[in-house]
Regions:
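Helix-to-loop junction immediately C-terminal to a conserved catalytic motif
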Residues: 56
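Conserved ABC transporter NBD signature motif
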Residues: 64-76
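Short coil-to-helix segment of the ABC ATPase nucleotide-binding domain corresponding to the Q-loop/switch region
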Residues: 93-102
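Conserved ABC ATPase "signature" region
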Residues: 112-131, 184
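Conserved ABC ATPase signature
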Residues: 136-140, 144
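Conserved catalytic motifs of ABC-family nucleotide-binding domains
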Residues: 157
Length: 302
């Protein structure tokens, strides 16, 4: 039996409530291949961050399992790097030392020069250098802090990179710049990424597939949308691809209308459970081609 790089099987998370257990999400099953960039989108409260915490080993599911490279995830590991929206930097250390701290933990046998050179290389990859690496987080802008956080995550060369709305607190210009840098780094390193976002345009720019969650409680992963657009992707050109707006319109329609229509009930029947365990695979760009619109190309394997 062929195994996928990341396998999520029938995840559920429940929390104690005044009237019994509250089921945030249930029967979440999906896979991610090595080198794939997958985004997950859904309204606040549907359990996206909780799923990410389970993948990171920071939380345990109420039901279900997560396997990475055939091994069940049961706790935190340097094989999984996490970037949070709030940066999570050590305030008493410089940008460089925030990265070297992680690198030393990953490779304790490296000498000081190896650690420093490796860390500085990743800071340069995200546009930090020429003295900025010596500043403490309080001396950096929000965008620069997030660059440090991203550099730290990439520097430990994790098998899986987890991004929890990493650009949500940034202004539009800074967010766009760092998104472009992330695209370049992921294309160069073939990094496997799972990312939470509320921004449909960001998801289309970055992802190979987009998972769509219904509203909570009893949230489900309803669809897996293929982003059938060519790489490398440039934000100045991607919006002109005939496949772009079919994908975007599909995502917006789900968030505005269908996410609520499909939400709010337990999977009491076999039909409901089958739907929850097997997200519908959707390819809006291909469907647009079949309807007579000509996309400029199919997504290339990374």
């Amino acid at each position: 039996m062929t195994r996928h790089f990341l396998e999520i099987e029938n995840l559920a998370r429940r929390f104690p409530g005044q009237d019994g257990e509250l089921t945030v999400f249930e029967n979440a099953s999906f896979t991610i291949e090595k080198g794939e960039f997958v985004c997950i989108i859904g309204h606040s409260g549907c359990g996206k961050s909780t799923i990410m915490n389970v993948l990171a080993g920071l939380d345990a599911p109420s039901e279900g399992h997560v396997f990475m490279d055939g091994v069940e995830v049961s706790g935190p590991s340097l094989e999984r790097g996490v970037v949070f929206q709030n940066y999570s930097l050590l305030p008493w250390l410089s940008a460089l030392h925030n990265v070297t701290f992680a690198v030393r933990s990953r490779w304790p046998g490296w000498d000081r020069d190896e650690v420093r050179e490796h860390s500085y290389r990743y800071l340069k990859m995200v546009g930090l250098g020429d003295g900025a690496e010596l500043r403490k987080p309080s001396q950096l802008s929000g965008g620069m802090r997030q660059r440090v956080s991203i550099a730290r995550a990439f520097a430990i060369q994790p098998k899986l990179l987890l991004l929890d709305e990493p650009f949500g607190a940034l202004d539009a210009l800074t967010r766009g710049t760092i998104q472009d840098e992330l695209v370049k780094i992921c294309d160069a390193t073939r990094q496997t990424v799972f990312m939470i976002t509320h921004d449909v345009d960001e998801a289309i720019l970055l992802a190979d597939r987009i998972l769509l969650m219904t509203n909570g409680p009893f949230a489900r992963i309803a669809e897996s949308v293929k982003v059938d657009l060519p790489r490398p992707r440039l934000r100045s050109k991607i919006i002109h691809d005939p496949g772009y707006y079919p994908i975007r319109n599909h995502l917006v329609d789900f968030l505005v209308r269908r996410s609520e229509e499909l939400s709010g009930k337990a999977t009491d029947t076999e039909e409901d459970t089958a739907f929850a365990e097997h997200p519908v695979e959707v390819n809006p760009a291909r469907d647009a081609l079949q309807d007579g619109q000509q996309p400029s190309g199919a997504a290339e394997a990374r």
